[in-house]
Amino acid sequence: KDMLDKPMFIETHRLAEFNPRGTDVPVVLDLMIHDIDIILSVVKSKVKHLSASGVSVISDTPDIANARIEFENGCVANLTASRISLKNMRKTRFFQRDAYISVDFLEKKCEVVKMKDAPQNPGDFDMILQNAEGLKKQIYFDNPEIAHNNAILDELETFADAITNNTRPIVTLHDGTEALRVATMIIDQF
């Protein structure tokens, strides 16, 4: 999260193989809501416009859904959730000025591509790009470590800790209700 600086386009794919358990819950509330919560915590702006579509393939509610959320600060998020995929995927990509950040939540991998002003005397192996105006940028690649932990266990432990120590939880009631409000707006589009 420290690497994110006003992303302007966010793309998420949360795809799951079919499991008959859970088809009574809309895919937006079962899967997409996690990405809605992440995006709202990163963007920190109000929803300006939302459009969505969903298709019921196996169950009575949409099994696959896509939503496009436009925020007041200009950021656009495109979210896809499916419970009828052939393989599992949990990826989010952030695009911001001079950086691209890809997070694979399933494989616990992160890829960061950043551009910075090029040095006066670049090395032989430095990757330098030059735009139409002649501005030179150097490309840097990074693969920061992602802790291999149990997200649900961590969430429950921090919640219990907030109760025990009378502190503010990491994810507040407001955060949860806002994610649910946006999820409901998406479902209302179907």
Description of each model-found segment:
Residues 1-8, 72-73:
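Basic phosphate/pyrophosphate-binding loop/patch that engages nucleotide-derived ligands
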Residues 3, 42, 162:
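Conserved catalytic core of Hanks-type protein kinase domains
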Residues 5-7, 47, 166:
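A general structural motif
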Residues 6-7, 11-17, 130:
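Mobile beta-alpha loop/short-helix "lid" or hinge segments that flank ligand
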Residues 13, 18-87, 91-95, 105-107, ...:
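Rossmann-like dinucleotide-binding domain that binds NAD(P)(H)
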Residues 42-45, 97-101, 186-189:
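Phosphate/oxyanion-binding loops and surfaces in catalytic or ligand/nucleic-acid-binding neighborhoods
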Residues 72, 153-190:
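C-terminal helix-rich "cap/oligomerization" subdomain common to oxidoreductases
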Residues 98-170:
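C-terminal glycine/acidic-rich active-site capping loop/insertion
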